[in-house]
From Swiss-Prot, chain C:
The lineage of its organism: Eukaryota, Metazoa, Ecdysozoa, Arthropoda, Hexapoda. InterPro entries: GPI_transamidase, Peptidase_C13. One of its GO terms (molecular function) is GPI-anchor transamidase activity. It comes from Drosophila melanogaster (Fruit fly). Its EC number is 3.-.-.-. Pfam families: Peptidase_C13 (PF01650). Mediates GPI anchoring in the endoplasmic reticulum, by replacing a protein's C-terminal GPI attachment signal peptide with a pre-assembled GPI. During this transamidation reaction, the GPI transamidase forms a carbonyl intermediate with the substrate protein. This is Putative GPI-anchor transamidase. Belongs to the peptidase C13 family. It is an enzyme of class 3 (hydrolase). Pathway: Glycolipid biosynthesis; glycosylphosphatidylinositol-anchor biosynthesis. It comes from the Eukaryota. The gene is PIG-K. Keywords: GPI-anchor biosynthesis, Hydrolase, Protease, Signal, Thiol protease.
C-alpha cells in the first residue's frame, strides 16, 4: 500500500509539473476564480520586491500577505525564481501526505470507537460502519481527491498562496487528529493572523483538547490568544511596524478590494449604497465567522473533525476573498465521511451544479470583460449558483451525518404504521 | 428547507423511478417544446419592435449639411480611381489614395504587414493599408471612430466595390471642414479583404507589444499614429455611386453582434434619407410580398442564425468586435441597369453621403461605448428583434434534456453486482439460484471511475491533437496544400476515434458511467457554446439532442433495429460527416444542374477546403469554430459512438476480473492512441 | 337602525355646513388695512439659486434653461454675488458645439443665453445633492468661498430654479444621485427655521415637476412646476445644425415673458404663473399657492426676479445718532467687574540658565 501512496504522490506531482509548463499556468495565475487579491502570485512577488527594497509593502494597496511568509520566501523568490513552481508543487504534495496521514489516523480512531460501541448498534447497519477495508480506501480517496482535483491542481500551477494556506490547514487537521496541542495551536494562530477566518477552527480545537473540562478549555483559549500575540509580534519584528495588521486583517475585514471573485461579497459591496456599508460589512463577516459556529459546535460536539470540515467549507463559501483552491481543499476532506454518503441525496446535483457553473464562469467572464456584451450580473449569477451548490453540499453532509447517527442505533428500516418513517429536524 | 433536508431515510425516490421509466418520453417532450418555442419566436407576439435606448445618439436631429458638391467630388474621384485601376491591376493605388488624403488635410499614414502562410512549405505575403486621421479640433485624442473601406484590386474575383474609396474620401473632405468632432475620425482603406483589417486592428491594439514573431502567422507590425480608444466603426462597401439598396451586415467573428442600438441607428438614418436598407435586404425587384409575416420572419431568423453559426464575419466590421468595438458594414448594392432612372447622375450618391454624415454625427455624440441596448438578439425583420431572454428558453429546454437524462441515468445506475448483471442482460436462467444466494449478501459494487476517466481523457486528447497536429512543423514542411493536410490529419484522428471502442472495452458499469459523463459534458458544452455563439449552440442542439435522447446503453429494453438505427445515426453525426453533408447541401443548392457524382466530388473538395479554412481562420483571426468542432464535438462523438456500440466485456471475463484481489478502481483499459 | 344612521349623517352634514359658513364669515370680517398690509412687499434683498442638475451633451436644453433664467434675473438687477449658479456641464465649450462659446435658446439664434459674463458658482461634479442641500440650509463646509454661499436672511426673497431629469418625487442629479421631494421640503423648512428667507419662489422645469413641491410645509412659499405628476415636460424644438434639443417649452415661454419685463415694470407674478398655457406647453403647469399668503396678482414679478426694494423717499429731517454703550447695557449694577490682575512678562529666551 505504501508504494501506491508514493506512486500517487509522484503522479500528482507529475500532473502539476506538466501543467506548470503549459501556457495554462500564467493564465490560471490571472484568473479571478483562483487568484484573489489575497493569494495572487503577482502580489506576493510585489511584496517581496518591496520588502527587499526596504519599503513597507503595506503602505500601498497591493500586498496582503503576512510579513513572515514574505520574508521566509524572499530568498527563494529573488535567487531561484525558476524553482518556484517546483516549490509550490512540493508544498502541495506535503499537504496531500499530511491529509493521508491524518485520514489514516482518523479511520483508526473511528474503528476503535466503533469497537467499543458495537453492541449498541442496530442490526443491518454494516454498510454504515467503518469496514476493515476503509483503513486503506478512505485515505486513498482523500489523497486522490486532493491530488487530482482540478481545483487544487490549477490553484497550485497558478502559484497562489492558497497552496500555503492549505498546507497549514492540513497540518492543523493532522495535529488535531494526532492530539498534538501545541503545534496545532501555533499553526492555527499563524493562519488566523494571516487570513483571519481560520479563527473559527478554535471550536473543534477546544472540543478535542479540553476533554469536557471548562478550565482546560479556558486555558487553551488563553494559550491561543497568547500564541496569536506571539505570531503578531514575530510579524512585527520583520518590519518593525504594525502596518501589516491593517494590510492583512484590516484588508480582509473591511473588504477594500472589490475585484470580482467566486464569493458573495464583491457584488453586494459594489451595488450597495455607501452608507449601509458598515452594517453589511459586519453582517457578512458575522455570517462568515460566528453565525454558524455556536449551533454547529453544540450539534457536532462529538465529531470535532466533522465540525472542522464543515467550518472550513463554510469559510470557503462565505469568506471575503474565496478562491477555488479553498473549495478544492474541503472537497478533499469529504471522503472522510464516506460512510455518510449513502444519505447524501444531492451529490450528483451538486456535482452537476459545480460543472455547469464553473464552465459558465469562464464563458461569462469572457463575455463580460473581453467581448463587452454581457455584464457583471451574468457573472455574479454564475458565482451565486456556485455558492448555492456548495451550501447544498454542506447541508447535505450535515444532514447525512445526522441520519447516519440515527440509523446506526435504530436500524435502517423503521416502519411506523406500515409507512416508512421520516426524520424531522427539531 | 425541504429541498435541503429531505426527511426520508431511504435514498430511493418514487418520483425518480417513475421519471426514469419514461425518460425518453419526457425528454422528447422537452425537445419538442424547445423547438416549438423557437418556431414561435417568429410570431409577432414573441418579438418586440426595435427602439433606440442610448439617449446620447440623438439620431436624425441634425439636418445633413453635405451637399451636391461632395457628390461631385466623389464622381470626380471615382473617375480618377478608375484610371488608376488600369495601371494597378492587382495592387492598390496606394500613392493616389495617400495623395488624396494628404490633399484633403488628413494626417496620412501607411501600415505594412506580413502574413506568413504556414502550409505547403510556407510563403510570405505583404500588404499595405492606408489610413488618415482627422483629429478632433477642440478635444484631446482620447477616442476615435473608424470609417473603413476595403479596396479590391481590379483582378479580384469578388464584386467590384471600388466606389467605396471615393465615397469615403468625399466624406473625409466634408468632415475636415467641420469643427464639431469630439472624437478623432480615422479613414481607413484596407486591402486583401479581412486580412488587412485584422492586421491593422492588431497593429492598432498590440502593435507596440513585443510578440514572439516565430510563432505568429500574421505579423501586424506597428502603426505610426493612433487616435485613442476606438468607440465604433463603420465599414463601407459600395458597388457604385448609383445604388439600389443598402444591406446592413452585422454578424461578426464568432457570431458576435454589434449593439442593437448601432443597427437601429443605421436603420433610422437610412430611412430618413429614403434609402431602402435593412438586414439581408433584397433588391427591389426580388422582394417577396406573397409570404406571410410568419414565414418572412422565420426565414430571416434562420438566415441570420445560419450566418452567425459559422462564426465567420460577413464583412470587415466583424473583426472589430473582437476588440470590443461595435461595428457594422453598410453594403450598398448597384442599381440594376435601367435608363429611365438615370436622370440625375449628378446627385446619385447624395443620400448615401447624407446617411454617412448622420451616422458619423450620432456616433460623435456618444459619451461612452454602446452599452444601453442588447448585444444578444436575433433580428426577425428590419424593425423587430428577439432578445436573449426570449430565445434562450428554446436552447435551455433542449439542454435540459441532457441534464435530466443524466440525472435519471445516474440515479438508476447499478449499485450491486446483481443489478449490473440484470442491466447487462447477462442473467441466465441457470444462474438464477446463484444470484438469489448472492442477493442475501449484496456485495457493494464500485463503479469504474478510473477507467472511465482515462477513456474520457483519451478522447479529449484526440480532440486536442486535431488542433495541434496540423500545425506541427513536421507536417507543415510537407509540400502539400492546407486542405489535404488538414483533412488527412482529421480523418486519421477520426479513424482512431472510430476504432477506439473496438479496441478498448470498458469494465462493467463503465458504459453507464460513461453515459452519465457524456450527458454532463454534452450539456455543459451546449450551454457554453450557446452563451458564446447562440446560433451554433442551437443548431448543434437541434441536430444532436434527438440522437442523445435515443441513445441507451441498456440492452434489455431496446430492439436491435432501433439500436442499428442509432448506430447509423451516430455515424452520420460524425463532425466531418456533418460538415460534408452541409457542404453537399449547399453545393446541390448552388449547382442543381450538375450530375450527382460530380456534385458529391465537388462537395468533397469544398469540405476539405472548408476544414482548412476553419483551421486558418482559427489561427489568424481567432475563429472558434474549428476549435469547438475538434475539441468538443469530436470527443463527444467518439463517446457517443462508444455508447451506441455498447461493447461489453464477456461476462466470464468479468467474473475472472472480479475474483482478483484488487477492489480499487484500477484503470483496466490500455488506451492506444497514436 | 338604518334610520338612526341616516339621521346622524344628516346632523353631521348640517354641522359641517354651519361651521363652513362661520369660517367664511370670519374671513370677510378681516380689516381692510390688514389685508392690504399682507399684500405689501416686505423683503429687503433678493437671492437666486439656479440649478441645472444634468450633464451630457444631449441635455443641452437644461443648460439653456438655467442660463435663460440666469440671464433674466441678472438683467433685472440681482447682482452676480447674489446668484448661485449650479451647472453640471459645460455646453458652451463642449467639443460637439459647432458654435463654441455660445448657448442659444432658439434655433434662429435670437438670444445667446451664455452671454458675455456668466459666473458659474458650482460646476461639473460640484453639482451634487449634498452641495445643493448644504447651500440651501447654510451648512456649507468650512472654507467654502463666499460666492458659493447663500447668505440670505429673514428679509430675503429667494428664487430657486431647478431643471434636469425628474420623476415622481425626485430630481436626478448627474445620473448618479437624486434629491427627493421630501429632502427638498426638509431643506426649505430648515431655511425657514433659520430665518434664511422672507418669501420663496420655487420654480422647477422637469418631468413630473409638480411632485417636487408636494411635500412643502413651510410658509411663504410659492411654487410653480412645468408639469403635473404623471406628465412629461417637453422640449421646445431642435436646432438641426447642432443636433440637440435647444430648450424646454416651459422655460422657453418663461424667458419670452421675462424678456419683456423691465426693472420697473408692473408685471406681476400672477401673470408669470400663466405664462405657458397647455396649448403651447403640452404639459400642464402646476402652481401651489396655499402656503403663500399674498395674492400673486398683486405681487410684482421683480419681487423675485429683480432686486427692486420698497424704498420711500422722505424729505423729512431724520436724526441719526450713533449707538452708545449705555443703550445696550440696561442693568449696570449687575455687571461683574473683572478683578485687576498682574501681568508678568516671560522672557523669550531662558538666558538666566547660561549665566
Amino acid at each position: 500500500m505504501d508504494s501506491k501512496f508514493f506512486k500517487l504522490l509522484l503522479l500528482g506531482g507529475a500532473v502539476r509539473f506538466y501543467f506548470c509548463r503549459t501556457p495554462l499556468a500564467p493564465m490560471i495565475g490571472n484568473r479571478v476564480e483562483f487568484a484573489t487579491p489575497l493569494n495572487s502570485h503577482k502580489r506576493m512577488q510585489e511584496g517581496i520586491f518591496l520588502l527587499q527594497s526596504g519599503i513597507d509593502p503595506y503602505l500601498g494597496d497591493l500586498v496582503h500577505e503576512s510579513p513572515l511568509i514574505l520574508s521566509a520566501l524572499s530568498g527563494l523568490f529573488q535567487k531561484y525564481p525558476q524553482f518556484l513552481p517546483i516549490f509550490y508543487i512540493i508544498l502541495d504534495i506535503c499537504t496531500a501526505a499530511l491529509l493521508y496521514a491524518m485520514s489514516l489516523r482518523f479511520v483508526k480512531q473511528k474503528q476503535d470507537q466503533q469497537d467499543k460501541e458495537r453492541k449498541e448498534y442496530a442490526k443491518d447497519t454494516e454498510e454504515l460502519q467503518f469496514g476493515p477495508l476503509d483503513k486503506l480506501d478512505i485515505p486513498e480517496l482523500v489523497i486522490v481527491a486532493y491530488l487530482f482535483s482540478p481545483l487544487t491542481v490549477m490553484s497550485c500551477i497558478g502559484m497562489t498562496s492558497t497552496v500555503i494556506s492549505n498546507l497549514f490547514l492540513a497540518f492543523f487537521f493532522y495535529c488535531l487528529v494526532k492530539g498534538m496541542l501545541i503545534p496545532c495551536l501555533l499553526v492555527l494562530a499563524f493562519e488566523t493572523v494571516r487570513s483571519f477566518y481560520p479563527i473559527v477552527l478554535i471550536a473543534p480545537l477546544l472540543l478535542v483538547f479540553s476533554r469536557n473540562s471548562v478550565r482546560r478549555g479556558v486555558a487553551i483559549a488563553a494559550l491561543f490568544i497568547v500564541s496569536c500575540l506571539i505570531v503578531a509580534v514575530a510579524n512585527y519584528f520583520v518590519l518593525n511596524s504594525w502596518n501589516f495588521l491593517d494590510g492583512t486583517l484590516g484588508f480582509i475585514f473591511y473588504f477594500r478590494d472589490l475585484q470580482p471573485n467566486i464569493g458573495l461579497f464583491w457584488y453586494f459591496f459594489t451595488e450597495m449604497f455607501e452608507h449601509f456599508r458598515t452594517m453589511f460589512l459586519i453582517t457578512f463577516q458575522l455570517n462568515a465567522t460566528v453565525l454558524y459556529l455556536v449551533p454547529l459546535s453544540i450539534k457536532l460536539r462529538k465529531e470535532p473533525l466533522l465540525l472542522a470540515t464543515v467550518l472550513v467549507a463554510l469559510m470557503a463559501v462565505f469568506r471575503a476573498y474565496p478562491s477555488l483552491g479553498d473549495v478544492g481543499f474541503y472537497l478533499a476532506l469529504l471522503p472522510l465521511w464516506k460512510r455518510c454518503w449513502k444519505f447524501m441525496a444531492h451529490g450528483f446535483v451538486v456535482f452537476t451544479f459545480f460543472l455547469v457553473t464553473l464552465s459558465m464562469m469562464g464563458a461569462l467572464w469572457h463575455l463580460w470583460i473581453y467581448a463587452g456584451s454581457a455584464n457583471a450580473n451574468f457573472y455574479f449569477g454564475a458565482t451565486l449558483a456556485f455558492s448555492t451548490g456548495q451550501i447544498f453540499l454542506i447541508t447535505d453532509l450535515l444532514f447525512a451525518h445526522v441520519k447516519r447517527e440515527f440509523c446506526l442505533f435504530n436500524g435502517q428500516k423503521i416502519l411506523i404504521d406500515g409507512e416508512e418513517a421520516r426524520i424531522v429536524l427539531k | 428547507m425541504g429541498l435541503l433536508s429531505d426527511p426520508s431515510i431511504s435514498t430511493q425516490s418514487k418520483l425518480v423511478d417513475g421519471l426514469a421509466r419514461h425518460v425518453r418520453k419526457v425528454c422528447y417532450a422537452l425537445y419538442v417544446a424547445g423547438v416549438a418555442w423557437f418556431f414561435c419566436l417568429a410570431l409577432p407576439e414573441f418579438n418586440h419592435g426595435t427602439y433606440l435606448s442610448e439617449n446620447a445618439l440623438s439620431p436624425g436631429l441634425v439636418y445633413p449639411e453635405i451637399r451636391i458638391d461632395a457628390n461631385r467630388l466623389a464622381i470626380q474621384l471615382l473617375e480618377e480611381l478608375q484610371r488608376e485601376r488600369k495601371d494597378h491591376l492587382s495592387t492598390t493605388p496606394h500613392a493616389w489614395i495617400a495623395a488624396k488624403m494628404n490633399e484633403f488635410g488628413l494626417e496620412t499614414h501607411t501600415h505594412n504587414y506580413t502574413l506568413r502562410y504556414p502550409f505547403g512549405g510556407g510563403k510570405e505575403y505583404h500588404g499595405k493599408n492606408i489610413y488618415g486621421i482627422l483629429r478632433a479640433p477642440r478635444i484631446a485624442s482620447t477616442e476615435g471612430i473608424v470609417f473603413a473601406a476595403p479596396y479590391r484590386a481590379a483582378s479580384s474575383v469578388h464584386t467590384d466595390i471600388s466606389a467605396s474609396v471615393p465615397l469615403l474620401l468625399a466624406f473625409a473632405d466634408f468632415a475636415r471642414r467641420k469643427n464639431y468632432w469630439a472624437k478623432d475620425l480615422i479613414f481607413l482603406i484596407t486591402e486583401q479583404e479581412q486580412l488587412g483589417m485584422q492586421a491593422w486592428l492588431e497593429a492598432y491594439h498590440d502593435g507596440d507589444r513585443e510578440l514572439d514573431l516565430s510563432k505568429a502567422y500574421l505579423r501586424p507590425g506597428n502603426l505610426p499614429a493612433r487616435a485613442g480608444s476606438l468607440q465604433a466603426a463603420l465599414n463601407i462597401e459600395v458597388q457604385d455611386l448609383e445604388i439600389d439598396h443598402v444591406d446592413v451586415r452585422i454578424e461578426g467573428l464568432n457570431g458576435k453582434l454589434p449593439n442593437l442600438d448601432m443597427f437601429n441607428l443605421v436603420q433610422r438614418i437610412m430611412a430618413r434619407e429614403g434609402i431602402a436598407s435593412g438586414y439581408k435586404q433584397a433588391p427591389r425587384k426580388k422582394r417577396r410580398h406573397s409570404q406571410s409575416h410568419f414565414e418572412q420572419n422565420f426565414r430571416q431568423m434562420l438566415t441570420m442564425l445560419a450566418s452567425q453559426s459559422s462564426g465567420v464575419p460577413t464583412g470587415n466590421h466583424g473583426l472589430f468586435h473582437r476588440y470590443r468595438i461595435d461595428a457594422l458594414t453598410i453594403a450598398a448594392n448597384r442599381r440594376a441597369t435601367h435608363a429611365t432612372l438615370k436622370g440625375s447622375p449628378g446627385s446619385a450618391a447624395v443620400p448615401l453621403l447624407k446617411a454617412i454624415e448622420g451616422i458619423a454625427r450620432s456616433l460623435n455624440n456618444l459619451l461612452e461605448r454602446f452599452h444601453q441596448s442588447f448585444f444578444f438578439y436575433v433580428i426577425v425583420s428590419n424593425d423587430r428583434y428577439i432578445s436573449i431572454g426570449d430565445y434562450m428558453p428554446a436552447l435551455v429546454a433542449l439542454v435540459a434534456c441532457a441534464f435530466l437524462k443524466a440525472y435519471l441515468t445516474w440515479s438508476t445506475l447499478p449499485a450491486t453486482n446483481a443489478e449490473l448483471e440484470k442491466a447487462a442482460g447477462w442473467l441466465r436462467e441457470h444462474e438464477q439460484e446463484a444470484e438469489l444466494e448472492e442477493n442475501l449478501e449484496p456485495d457493494k459494487f464500485e463503479l469504474p471511475y478510473g477507467s472511465v476517466l482515462i477513456y474520457l481523457t483519451a478522447t479529449l486528447l484526440i480532440g486536442f491533437l486535431c488542433n495541434v497536429l496540423p500545425l506541427q512543423q513536421y507536417f507543415l514542411e510537407i509540400p502539400m496544400g492546407a486542405a489535404p493536410l488538414t483533412t488527412s490529419v482529421l480523418s486519421f484522428l477520426s479513424l482512431i476515434g472510430f476504432v477506439l471502442p473496438f479496441v478498448v472495452v470498458l469494465p462493467p458499469g463503465g458504459l453507464e458511467l460513461l453515459h452519465v459523463a457524456f450527458l454532463l459534458i454534452y450539456g455543459c458544452a451546449l450551454i457554453v457554446i450557446g452563451l458564446l455563439n447562440f446560433a451554433l449552440g442551437l443548431f448543434a442542439a437541434v441536430l444532436t439532442v434527438p440522437l442523445v435522447i435515443a441513445l441507451e446503453t441498456k440492452e434489455e429494453n431496446s430492439r436491435s433495429t432501433l439500436r442499428n438505427t442509432i448506430r447509423l445515426a451516430t455515424l452520420v453525426m460524425n463532425p466531418m460527416m456533418v460538415v460534408y453533408v452541409i457542404v453537399l447541401a449547399m453545393t446541390f443548392y448552388q449547382f442543381p444542374e450538375l450530375p450527382v457524382q460530380k456534385i458529391m466530388l465537388r462537395a468533397a473538395t469544398a469540405a476539405m477546403d472548408a476544414s482548412a479554412y476553419g483551421l486558418i481562420d482559427s489561427v489568424i483571426y481567432g475563429n472558434w469554430l474549428y476549435f469547438v468542432i475538434c475539441t468538443i464535438f469530436l470527443p463527444l462523438w467518439i463517446i457517443c459512438w462508444t455508447l451506441s456500440l455498447s461493447k461489453r466485456r464477456d461476462y466470464a471475463d468479468y467474473l475472472d476480473f472480479d475474483e482478483s484481489p484488487s477492489t480499487s478502481p484500477q484503470p483496466q483499459s490500455k488506451v492506444k492512441t497514436n | 337602525m338604518f334610520n338612526i344612521m341616516l339621521v346622524k349623517f344628516v346632523v353631521i352634514f348640517a354641522l359641517i355646513l354651519a361651521s363652513c359658513r362661520v369660517e367664511a364669515d370670519n374671513t370677510s370680517v378681516l380689516p381692510e388695512g390688514f389685508v392690504d398690509a399682507a399684500q405689501r412687499s416686505t423683503h429687503t434683498n433678493n437671492w437666486a439659486v439656479l440649478v441645472d442638475a444634468s450633464r451630457f451633451w444631449f441635455n443641452y436644453r437644461h443648460v439653456a434653461n438655467v442660463l435663460s433664467i440666469y440671464r433674466s434675473v441678472k438683467r433685472l438687477g440681482i447682482p452676480d454675488s447674489q446668484i448661485i449658479l449650479m451647472i453640471a456641464d459645460d455646453m458652451a465649450c463642449n467639443a460637439r458645439n459647432p458654435r463654441p462659446g455660445q448657448v442659444y435658446n432658439n434655433a434662429n439664434q435670437h438670444i445667446n443665453v451664455y452671454g458675455d459674463d456668466v459666473e458659474v458658482d458650482y460646476r461639473g461634479y460640484e453639482v451634487t445633492v449634498e452641495n445643493f442641500v448644504r447651500l440651501l440650509t447654510g451648512r456649507t463646509q468650512n472654507g467654502t468661498a463666499r460666492s458659493k454661499k447663500l447668505l440670505s436672511d429673514a428679509g430675503s426673497n429667494v428664487l430657486i430654479y431647478l431643471t434636469g431629469h425628474g420623476g415622481d418625487g425626485f430630481l436626478k442629479f448627474q445620473d448618479s444621485e437624486e434629491i427627493t421631494s421630501q429632502e427638498l421640503a426638509d431643506g426649505i423648512q430648515q431655511m425657514w427655521e433659520k430665518k434664511r428667507y422672507n418669501e420663496l419662489f420655487f420654480m422647477v422645469d422637469t418631468c413630473q415637476a409638480a411632485s417636487l413641491y408636494e411635500k412643502f410645509t413651510s410658509p411663504n412659499v410659492l411654487a410653480v412646476a412645468s408639469s403635473l405628476v404623471g406628465e412629461d415636460s417637453l422640449s421646445h424644438h431642435v436646432d438641426p445644425s447642432i443636433g440637440v434639443y435647444m430648450i424646454d417649452r416651459y422655460t422657453y415661454y418663461a424667458l419670452e415673458f421675462l424678456e419683456k419685463v423691465q426693472p420697473f415694470s408692473k408685471r406681476t407674478i400672477g401673470e408669470f404663473l400663466q405664462v405657458c398655457p397647455k396649448r403651447v406647453c403640452i404639459s400642464t403647469v402646476g402652481v401651489r399657492k396655499d402656503l403663500y399668503p399674498r395674492d400673486p396678482h398683486k405681487v410684482p414679478i421683480t419681487d423675485f426676479f429683480g432686486a427692486i426694494r420698497p424704498t420711500r423717499v422722505s424729505t423729512d429731517r431724520i436724526n441719526v445718532t450713533l449707538a452708545n454703550e449705555d443703550d445696550f447695557i440696561f442693568d449696570k449694577d449687575k455687571m461683574v467687574t473683572k478683578k485687576p490682575f498682574k501681568i508678568v512678562m516671560e522672557s523669550q529666551f531662558p538666558s538666566e540658565l547660561f549665566k
